[in-house]
Swiss-Prot record:
It comes from Homo sapiens. It catalyses: Ca(2+)(out) + K(+)(out) + 4 Na(+)(in) = Ca(2+)(in) + K(+)(in) + 4 Na(+)(out). One of its GO terms (molecular function) is symporter activity. Calcium, potassium:sodium antiporter that transports 1 Ca(2+) and 1 K(+) in exchange for 4 Na(+). Critical component of the visual transduction cascade, controlling the calcium concentration of outer segments during light and darkness. Light causes a rapid lowering of cytosolic free calcium in the outer segment of both retinal rod and cone photoreceptors and the light-induced lowering of calcium is caused by extrusion via this protein which plays a key role in the process of light adaptation. It holds the Pfam family Na_Ca_ex. This is Sodium/potassium/calcium exchanger 1. It is a multi-pass membrane protein. The modification Phosphoserine is found at residue 658. The chain crosses the membrane at residues 453-473, 498-518, 523-543, 564-584, 586-606, 908-928, 936-956, 972-992, 1011-1031, 1040-1060, 1069-1089. Residues 123-134 have a biased composition (Polar residues). It is found in: Cell membrane. Glycans are attached at residue 290. Alpha- repeats lie at residues 494-534, 979-1010.
């Protein structure tokens, strides 16, 4: 150039023409490029990538929608000189994809200008949450009023400002240069981008909010920017911004230009907001307008896997916490509060968002002034360190913990207590389940239609499913489990604790599974806790109210099950304290169940050992009493008593030993049979009982008459006190009354004194009578004979026990238990075998008592022997008849499901009512009660599980619809309606069994099924969830469930202590009290869940 100039004017002229020529070409070329670019940008579908980016912004658009137009105008109206720092910062997030620069440039454009304005105008802007886009927003608004106002504000001007700082530097420089990139983009197509961005970006900018603007200022410095980027790192956004493939940035930009800026700048402030909005507000709108399945997918441009949605999701969770905490030290507490509020705004709770937005402006503005106030990354406090001055609060959301950690907890906690409390909403982004909405199919009726009365259909369907679940369990599932136990040769006790408990608790187990994996709620926990309280209070209380007599409970089965239940409840309460269930906690609960099953395997041995330990003190007491009168003979008698006890205890174990297996087919009449074949089962049981009692009363009348005739008038009163002490421990065993028919007064006294527990009374009474008679009146020879006879009797009883056990496997142990508990004059089988020896022993005792040692005693003894033998023969006949009846009942219970048309009209109506349930089951599931179908028990087992799962899903779904219509949560539905519905079949069975005299089986079964629910029904879904999601903990936070579990624990202690204080008997007053306590529990639980009252024991 210089040479040409020197050469001369002509050459100089030629040179000038050349320069003009090239300038014109460049100008024309630039115009063509600008024009074509403008046209492409103007057409929404011109660039698919741009359109996608715009659509991704739509969620942000919703965010802008949150702010009133006035607020937005305020933001734009208060023009603030764009700070270069701000512009640069904003640009940083925007600088992204080179190819999409044009598209992004518009967004960037807007963003940069927004930051500038934000710096000064943030106070006003903050109100809108879109303050960053204040001036820019205005322009955007003008460009595209349809789009969020903020976006409309976008102007190329902002891009120019950014251009000033524009530097095409690698992402590493992004902090400083990224604004430049943004400017570049702005230069290219500010207005076109403005439009699109106007539609989508505005909301993005709004989403970014003043917080973003503030952050950009903070990020103006490289260090500040770094902090911003770190924030993005925490969330996938950071990754996008820093890693930033330009695409990533672009994608982020496109999807949420403000979002990225926001996150980078405002410590994820806007990002949370964006997320919140996305979750609450934009999902419908944004998605619709964007016409993209996932607006976040745009962000995903850079990160398809972690599209904007992903980023938003992660950021929201993290940023939520972060934003809450992000405040500048420089800013006053008020600022901090405002900042937090702003964060809250973006948070998924819309309530906070409005107020937060208002407060945020001031804070953001101040922060803008202080560029070093870059929020620290949620996960990386290091960023905080960099901007120590201003990075005051950065909520660090750890991936596992749900709790947010704040540098300055005082402000954060005071401002946002709920956010800091452990709740699924604050869970780290890594947790896949943030309790989204339940995965239910669309309902035929809207909420308004249901409230007009159509909800009645849902209520009816829910009740109908309760019946269906009971039929599936009773008719197919439990029989299939019975076949499995036979094949595996599992003992009755273990089967009752495992398979039979599973049969009765299957609905609760599947409800828990549905609650964890489908409805994403605590409905399973509520159902299991509510069912536990229902079983303990309502079922046991109803049994005692409707039983024909006071329930005398065997203490060992109840003590054993309640001990395990208390241990399991304590574990559950401890695990609930942090509102997260880790995988190892679920495993511990399962191991507790395995320990329970192991204990049931050795139940008889443990029971014998425990009772032997407990029996030493009462026996010593008897020894002392006897030693006072007859020291010499007392020791012999006591040794004999202990031997007899060891031999006799096993025969008593049959009662209640498998008490957890209330679902045994020998005991349980299925719901279908009850509804069709015995519409009034309680009445039939009552009639049968009355017949039995009449025959027993006749026998009892004959006995006293015979005794009165044979007894001499002169009875020795001195011997009576000793005799009354002896039977004292007899309270629980009615079988003792049979062996000592005339000793009912003594039994009453024994119950009142209650010196010794349970079964010990029987042997103690007999032993002491022998002591008395042998020591005082009998010659030694007679005493030896008596001892031998007694030993034979015990051996015979032992044999009877073996026989009873065998029968228990084939026909159920109920016969033996019936004999002992009903008072049918003796233990059923042992009576037959030891009738003669038994009679002789008693005749000897009574003869000695009556005759003293006189000569007339022998004749009287002979007469008594004859009379008692006759009575016992009659008793044996009655017992045989009862056994036959019970066998018939068992056969009836074992009959396969029949679809025969019933006779009466009432039964026909019930048949038609149940046909929609029974007919599909009859078609699809083999009935293992038919011999030819027994080999298909595996198909029955699997088929019934599928039906139970389907019915449980319908039950939970319709319960959710009913709760949604009425306005109550799924947790409350589980605690109340679902818990009662799944437990009603057990309630009916328990009442029938209790009226038959097997009260302790009904009571112990209620506790046993609860053990299965807590140690299998709850931890199995939790463990599966953790295994599927990489051993992540399961969130179980709920307002009232923790307190409900504590209440359940207290109720259990009350029930057991009350029963024990009443000598293991349950009267009607105690039953009525438990009945009322159940309703008190329901009222308190509902009030806790609805936050009407606060839980005093919550952590």
């Amino acid at each position: 150039m210089g040479k040409l100039i020197r050469m001369g004017p002509q050459e100089r002229w030629l040179l000038r023409t050349k320069r003009l020529h090239w300038s014109r070409l460049l100008f024309l070329l630039g115009m063509l490029i600008i024009g074509s670019t403008y046209q492409h940008l103007r057409r929404p579908r011109g660039l698919s990538s741009l359109w996608a980016a715009v659509s991704s912004h739509q969620p942000i658009k919703l965010a802008s929608r949150d702010l009133s137009s006035e607020e937005m105008m305020m933001m734009s109206s208060s023009p603030s000189k764009p700070s270069s720092e701000m512009g640069g910062k904003m640009l940083v997030p925007q600088a992204s994809v080179g190819s999409d620069e044009a598209t992004l440039s518009m967004t960037v454009e807007n963003i940069p200008s927004m930051p500038k304005r934000t710096a000064k105008m943030i106070p006003t802007t903050t109100k809108n949450n879109y303050s960053p886009t204040a001036a820019g927003t205005e322009r955007r608004k003008e460009d595209t009023p349809t789009s969020s106002r903020t976006l409309t504000y976008y102007t190329s001007t902002s891009s120019r400002q950014i251009v000033k700082k524009y530097t095409p530097t690698p992402r590493g420089e992004m902090k400083s240069y990224s604004p430049t990139q943004v400017r570049e983009k702005v230069k290219y197509t500010p207005s076109p981008r403005g439009r699109r961005v106007g539609t989508y970006v505005p909301s993005t900018f709004m989403t970014m909010e003043t917080s973003h603007a503030i952050t950009p200022r903070t990020t103006v410095k490289d260090s500040d920017i770094t902090a911003t980027y770190k924030i993005l790192e925490t969330n996938s956004l950071k990754r996008i911004m820093e890693e930033t493939t330009p695409t990533t940035l672009k994608g982020m930009f496109d999807s949420t230009p403000t979002f990225l800026t926001h996150e980078v700048e405002a410590n994820v402030l806007t990002s949370p907001r964006s997320v919140m909005e996305k979750n609450n507000l934009f999902p419908p709108r944004r998605v619709e307008s964007n016409s993209s399945a996932h607006p976040w997918g745009l962000v995903g441009k850079s990160n398809p896997k972690t599209p904007q949605g992903t980023v938003l999701l992660h950021t929201p969770a993290t940023s939520e916490g972060q934003v809450t905490i992000s405040t500048m030290t420089g800013s006053s507490p008020a600022e901090t509060k405002a900042f937090t509020a702003a964060w809250s705004l973006r948070n998924p709770s819309p309530r906070t968002s409005v107020s937060a937005i208002k407060t945020a402006p001031a804070i953001v503005w101040r922060l803008a002034k202080k560029p070093s106030t870059a929020p620290s990354t949620s996960t990386t406090p290091t960023v905080r360190a960099k901007l120590t001055m201003q990075v005051h609060h950065c909520v660090v959301v750890k991936p596992t913990p749900a709790m947010l950690t704040t540098p300055s907890p005082s402000l954060t906690t005071a401002l946002l207590p709920e956010e800091l409390s452990p709740s699924p909403s604050v869970l780290p982004p890594s947790l896949p389940d943030l309790h989204p909405k339940g995965e239910y199919p669309p309902d035929l009726f809207s909420v308004e239609e249901r409230r007009q009365g159509w909800v009645v259909l849902h209520v009816f369907g829910m009740m109908y499913v309760f019946v269906a679940l009971a039929i599936v369990c009773d008719e197919y599932f439990v029989p299939a489990l019975g076949v499995i136990t036979d094949k595996l040769q599992i003992s009755e006790d273990v089967a009752g604790a495992t398979f039979m408990a599973a049969g009765g608790s299957a609905p609760e187990l599947f409800t828990s599974l549905i609650g964890v994996f489908i409805s994403h709620s605590n409905v399973g926990i509520g159902t299991i806790v509510g069912s536990a309280v229902f079983n303990i209070l309502f079922v046991i209380g109803t049994c005692s109210l409707f039983s024909r007599e006071i329930l005398n409970l065997t203490w060992w089965p109840l003590f054993r099950d309640v001990s395990f239940y208390i241990l399991d409840l304590i574990m559950l309460i401890l695990f609930f304290l942090d509102s997260l269930i880790a995988w190892w906690e679920s495993l511990l609960l399962l191991l507790a169940y395995a320990f329970y099953v192991f204990t049931m395997k050795w139940n008889k041995h443990i029971e014998v050992w425990v009772k032997e330990q407990l029996s030493r003190r009462p026996v010593a007491k008897v020894m002392a009493l006897e030693d006072l009168s007859k020291p010499g003979d007392g020791a012999i008698a006591v040794d004999e008593l202990q031997d007899n006890k060891k031999l006799k205890l096993p025969s008593l174990l049959t009662r209640g030993s498998s008490s957890t297996s209330l679902h045994n087919s020998t005991i349980r009449s299925t719901i279908y049979q009850l509804m069709l074949h015995s519409l009034d089962p309680l009445r039939e049981v009552r009639l049968a009982k009355e017949k039995e009692e009449e025959s027993l009363n006749q026998g009892a009348r004959a006995q006293p008459q015979a005794k009165a005739e044979s007894k001499p008038e002169e009875e020795e009163p001195a011997k009576l006190p000793a005799v009354t002490v002896t039977p004292a421990p007899v309270p629980d065993i009615k079988g003792d009354q049979k062996e000592n028919p005339g000793g009912q007064e003594d039994v009453a006294e024994a119950e009142s004194t209650g010196e010794m527990p349970g079964e010990e009374g029987e042997t103690a009474g007999e032993g002491e009578t022998e002591e008395k008679s042998g020591g005082e009146t009998q010659p030694e020879g007679e005493g030896e004979t008596e001892t031998q006879g007694k030993g034979e009797e015990c051996e015979d009883e032992n044999e009877a026990e073996g026989k009873g056990d065998n029968e228990g496997e084939d026909e159920g142990e109920i016969h033996a238990e019936d004999g002992e508990m009903k008072g049918n004059e003796g233990e059923t089988e042992s009576q037959e075998l030891s009738a003669e020896n038994h009679g002789e022993a008693k005749n000897d005792e009574k003869g000695v008592e009556d005759g003293g040692g006189s000569d007339g005693g022998d004749s009287e003894e002979e007469e008594e022997e004859e009379e008692e033998q006759e009575e016992e023969e009659e008793e044996e006949e009655q017992e045989e008849e009862e056994e036959e009846e019970e066998e018939e009942e068992e056969k009836g219970n074992e009959e396969p499901l029949s679809l025969d048309w019933p006779e009466t009209r009432q039964k026909q109506a019930i048949y038609l009512f149940l046909l929609p349930i029974v007919f599909p089951l009859w078609l699809t599931v083999p009935d293992v009660r038919r011999q030819e179908s027994r080999k298909f028990f595996v198909f029955t087992f699997l088929g019934s599980i599928m039906w139970i799962a389907m019915f449980s899903y319908l039950m939970v779904w319709w319960a959710h619809q009913v709760g949604e219509t009425i306005g109550i949560s799924e947790e409350i539905m589980g605690l109340t309606i679902l818990a009662a519905g799944t437990s009603i079949p057990d309630l009916i069975t328990s009442v029938i069994v209790a009226r038959k005299g097997l009260g302790d089986m009904a009571v112990s079964s209620s506790v046993g099924s609860n053990i299965f629910d807590i140690t299998v029904g709850l931890p199995v879904p939790w463990l599966l969830f953790s295994l599927i999601n990489g051993l992540q903990p399961v969130p179980v936070s709920s307002n009232g469930l923790f307190c409900a579990i504590v209440l359940l624990f207290l109720m259990l202690l009350f029930v057991i202590s009350s029963i024990a204080s009443c000598k293991w008997r349950m009267n009607k007053i105690l039953g009525f009290t438990m009945f009322l306590l159940y309703f008190v529990f329901l009222i308190i639980s509902v009030m806790l869940e609805d936050r009407i009252i606060s839980c005093p024991v919550s952590v």
